[in-house]
Amino acid sequence: MITLYDLVLQDDRRPSPFCWRAKFALKHKGLAWRDEPMGFTEKQKIAFAQSQTVPVIHDGPTVVKDSWAIAQHLESAYPEKPLFGPARHHAHFVASWVDSAVQPALFPIVVSDLYDPK
């Protein structure tokens, strides 16, 4: 079974949009996975992946970090229910645009909600 290392807050909220992407890909493909929640200070949990950030997946002997690399791995290892179809390059463009334009604009909103939940 695939293990997904996911950022979790003390109140069990999952704030990482990068982990959300990995979960969306897993769900779309119909794959079962086990969440391995980790806090901001628990980086030792993903030391085996030589990564400081999530998401990281452990898929059998294969370790993959970064949401885009995870999507590519899942597409290759589990070709049923394709994620991208013939538009893989377009999907990568959109993901890069979201990372560079949309997420920075949303970050202050998300962070203020994390520190001042209503």
Regions found by a protein language model. Name each.
Residues 1-118:
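GST-like domain detector, emphasizing the conserved glutathione-binding G-site
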